């Protein structure tokens, strides 16, 4: 994760243009950028919570999309979704989890509690991707409705914390552990090459017994290795 992305930095609205379409949900009608894949609830959040410019991290969006795909598969097994709906959700969720549609998630980290709006942002983008891929209009909720189908059998209070865990594990596996391995290898190499260098140890502000610089560096290496194993 390279810090929390910003709206300005990603230019998430720059490609949307000035044309609008109308999206409808249980709360009524709202205007959305014509080419945007998000829907009414996401747009309301953009309108009502224009606070700061830090966006929800893409890694969390990708993890939440993975969960949507898995939920669709299970719902299909229990005949709560048709095979067509499962396939449409899984295809869209996979594309999102790969980062293909990162510019369709404009919400700030400053929003109402529990992540409900981000959950709906993912639901709406999946719904509209499915609509577009099957030749239906954006906002038609055909073949999958963002709430009734994409979010079926889920609660934000479960899905969002689960996505946090998934994102943390993926970042750990893909980013942190490989970097720690490189650091451990580098310290191991330095420990070996610096065994002939003698330095004075320190006890607080006083000189202590002599020791090899390689021994000191090997202690750093072992501490990092132990921390890696705990992770």
Indicate residue ranges for each PLM-predicted region:
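Conserved, well-structured ligand/cofactor-binding cores
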Residues: 2-231
């Amino acid at each position: 994760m390279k810090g929390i992305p910003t709206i300005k930095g990603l230019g998430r609205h720059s490609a949307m243009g000035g044309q609008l379409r109308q999206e409808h949900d249980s709360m009524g009608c709202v205007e959305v950028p014509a080419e945007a894949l998000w829907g009414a609830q996401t747009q309301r959040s953009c309108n009502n919570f224009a606070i700061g410019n830090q966006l929800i991290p893409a890694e969390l969006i990708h993890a939440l999309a993975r969960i949507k795909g898995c939920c669709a598969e299970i719902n299909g097994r229990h005949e709560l979704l048709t095979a067509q709906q499962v396939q449409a959700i899984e295809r869209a969720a996979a594309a999102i989890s790969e980062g293909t549609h990162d510019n369709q998630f404009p919400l700030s980290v400053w929003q109402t509690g529990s992540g409900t709006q981000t959950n709906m942002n993912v639901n709406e983008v999946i719904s509209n991707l499915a609509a577009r891929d099957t030749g239906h209009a954006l906002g038609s909720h055909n073949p999958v409705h963002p709430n009734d189908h994409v979010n079926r059998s889920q609660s934000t209070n479960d899905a969002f914390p689960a996505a946090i865990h998934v994102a943390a594990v993926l970042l750990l596996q893909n980013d942190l552990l490989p970097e720690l391995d490189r650091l451990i290898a580098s310290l191991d190499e330095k420990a070996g090459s610096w065994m002939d260098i003698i330095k004075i140890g320190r006890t607080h502000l006083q000189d202590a017994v002599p020791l090899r610089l390689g021994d000191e560096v090997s202690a750093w290496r072992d501490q990092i290795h132990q921390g890696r194993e705990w992770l």
